[in-house]
């Protein structure tokens, strides 16, 4: 839910209050990603380790008619691998066999927010990770202030993999 509603800040800055709201569908509603009446986050039991955010839009106006996030089961395993590999040198929590729920929850929130970006029509912005110099990413003051390793949620730079044990950064 929070990964969806993280977009509220951007919409409010553009003048749209409550533009995107995440709600649990009632049990009486059977909706899936093919039902144009609902925009849903759909869990798919699959060996695939990914997520995606497709949308249907009116080519005449650009209006998004319906948008979904498809969340495959094994995305959790790839997130765990990314956290362990990219932050294990500085993050003691990432060195555990089972990662803490708080760490995995933040990772899932990031992916949900990223995929909602795709549902809103945004493409990857891989140049965003070049916005911050390496020495800044190794600065505890900078990383505490910025709370991010890239200037866009649409980049894949989810974790600070340039931080070194002597930098004092633990995430």
Where are the regions that the model predicts?
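Catalytic Zn2+-binding segment of zinc metalloproteases
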Residues: 116-131
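Residue-level preference for alpha-helix termini and adjacent loops
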Residues: 56, 70, 125, 136, ...
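Conserved catalytic/binding loops enriched for acidic/polar residues
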Residues: 129-171
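Metzincin-family zinc-dependent endopeptidase catalytic domain
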Residues: 3-119, 145-149, 159-162
């Amino acid at each position: 839910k929070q990964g969806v509603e993280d977009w509220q800040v951007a919409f409010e800055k553009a003048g749209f209050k409550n533009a995107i709201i995440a709600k649990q569908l009632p049990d009486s509603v059977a909706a899936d990603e093919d039902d144009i009446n609902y925009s849903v986050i759909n869990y798919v039991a699959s060996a695939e380790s990914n997520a995606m955010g497709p949308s249907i839009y009116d080519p005449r106006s650009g209006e998004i008619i319906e948008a979904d996030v498809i969340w495959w089961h094994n995305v959790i395993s790839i997130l765990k691998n990314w956290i362990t590999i990219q932050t294990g040198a500085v993050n003691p929590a990432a060195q555990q066999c089972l990662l803490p729920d708080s760490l995995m929850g933040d990772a899932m929130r990031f992916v949900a927010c990223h995929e909602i970006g795709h549902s809103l029509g945004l493409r990857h912005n891989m140049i965003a990770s070049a916005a911050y110099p390496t020495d800044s990413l190794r600065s505890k003051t900078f990383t505490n202030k910025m709370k991010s390793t890239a200037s866009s949620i649409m980049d894949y730079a989810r974790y600070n993999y340039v931080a070194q044990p002597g930098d004092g950064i633990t995430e």
